[in-house]
Amino acid sequence: MPRLLLIETSTSLCSTALAEDGRIICSRRSTEPRAHASLTAVFVKEMLEESGWTVRELDAVAVSAGPGSYTGLRVGSSTAKGLCFGGQVPLIAVSTLDILARQAIEAGLPEGCKAILPMVDARRMEVYTAVNSPEGARLTDISPVILDENSFADLFASGPVAVIGDAAEKFAPLRATAASPWRTCPPPDPGRGRGPSEMGGAVVSAANEVPPEAGCGCANGSVFMQCCPEASAMLVPAMRKYEKKEFEDTAYFEPFYLKQFIATTPKKLF
């Protein structure tokens, strides 16, 4: 089985992991603000020393392809590309939304789940999102969306949905307004011995919008997981790409930065 280095820097969480034989053997993470540039390379160095590997002994380097913050993605992609050039190993790019979808699967989907809705915060009520199947397959293109009470109404009407990402907490109250009561679940824990507080995630709380006693389940059992993407959750989608030899052109690879937001909500004509 291949040896993979996994780098995830698309949001406020900076995380890295090493995998062998389809399992994570070591990882590093930090939620320290604006520390991606100073920590990513350090984390990689520490893990390689811990494992006893060299960069040339890696079979591939996988990095988050976005969408995400410009600074974080730039740090992650430049680190990954430098390692690939220096070690002469291939580069794998994994969508941030696909990483989140995998985290939802590892955390546990609601019974009868119809879809996974990963979301990356783009400030205000703006998000980047896509619809994934309960198995994690992408069903729609990544697109910018301005959230309101009617967002994805048809999707929620079809059955339980798992919403995950650093924008889940701002979408949950909108769905609670549209279909109260609702419930939340803990963020995923793909690492070894890490609890929710150490994950950089949090249970979405209805305390500010809907009192907890309002109910123990959304009208259709949907759940909302507030968390950031983790490097360890990249393993499964990265392995799929590795097996298919879906490698990037290292010299020309650029991640999907959060650019100027152009999504709009329809205006009333009368």
Can you say where each PLM-predicted feature lies in the sequence?
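Acyltransferase
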Residues: 224-270
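Residues at secondary-structure transition points
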Residues: 31-39, 70, 74, 78, ...
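N-terminal beta-alpha supersecondary unit
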Residues: 1-65, 228
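Phosphate-handling active-site elements
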Residues: 49-56, 85-94, 109-111
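DPxDG-like acidic metal-binding loop motif
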Residues: 62-96
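Surface "functional belts" at beta-alpha junctions
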Residues: 23, 90-189, 198-229, 262-263, ...
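Conserved hydrophobic/aromatic positions in well-ordered beta-strands
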Residues: 17, 128-132, 256
